[in-house]
Structure formats: C-alpha cells, structure tokens
Design a protein with these regions (language model features):
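Residues lining hydrophobic/aromatic ligand-binding pockets adjacent to catalytic sites
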Residues: 1-141
Length: 141
C-alpha cells in the first residue's frame, strides 16, 4: 500500500498525526527542492521530526518537478511525458512500508503526486491520498 499527501494548510503536528494514523513507516519527499516557506517542512527539520516519530525520511528529487517547469504552467503534462515512464513501483520495495509520497500541494488532483499514484496503480499497487477532506487550514497544530 502506498499513500500520498500534501502538507499545504496542515501544521506539522497534524501532518505527523495523519502519517501515524495510517502507520506510514517511510515518507518519500517528491519535491524537486526539499525546502518550504514553512520551515517545519524543509528537508532537515522535517527529517529530524519524523525520525523522532519513528518514520524514515527520504528525498526523491528525481520524482520532483523543476521550478522552471512549474513556472511555465505545464507541470502535469511535463511530468506525464518525462517522469511517469521512469516511475517503477519496485522503488517502494527499497523502503519500509507503507510509504507515503509527499509534496506541498494540498489537492492530489492538482499535483504531480497524482501521476506517481496512477503509475504505481498501473503496476499493480494499491494506494490513496491521505489529505483530510474538508480539513480547515492551519499554520500550526
């Protein structure tokens, strides 16, 4: 089983709670650049927090969308053409499961992690997005 989640609108405490409720063992950061305006979600700080919760953190830059592509406004199309063919479901076997692919975008429908999820499902894996539907936005929880 694989999961995806975006952190936009979630505080770090709520984010970690969601991961733990779903027994996530490894968080796979699929941002090209693992930095955030919310420092709780920047690579080193996030990895340290997750380690304290018993969740492994890995940055998979190769599954991210470069900034110039995002700024051009065609990230999903670019991702389908350039990255989706390289996605192998077997990558999750390198990590303790279940795994969760993370990006910033709140809605999986507006994010490249949807393409990761589709590619994994096409290869026989089951998965779903964990972002809580109807959750109120919060800076810290």
């Amino acid at each position: 089983m694989i999961f995806t989640i975006g952190y936009d609108g979630l505080g770090i405490n709520r984010f970690v709670q969601i991961l733990k409720e779903n027994e996530v063992r490894t968080l796979l950061d699929c941002r090209f650049n693992a930095v955030s305006m919310n420092s709780d979600f920047s690579k080193n700080k996030l990895a340290l927090r997750l380690e304290g919760e018993g969740i492994r953190y890995e940055h998979l830059k190769e599954y991210g969308v470069p900034g110039k592509v995002r700024r051009a406004g065609n990230a999903i199309e670019w991702y389908i053409e350039n990255i989706k063919p390289t996605i192998q479901a077997s990558i999750v076997n390198r990590f303790e499961q279940p795994v969760c692919f993370m990006c910033m975008e709140r809605s999986v429908d507006d994010c490249h992690r949807r393409i990761i999820l589709i590619a994994m499902q096409e290869q026989g894996m089951q998965g779903r997005d964990l972002y809580p539907k109807g959750e109120k936005s919060a800076k810290k929880r």
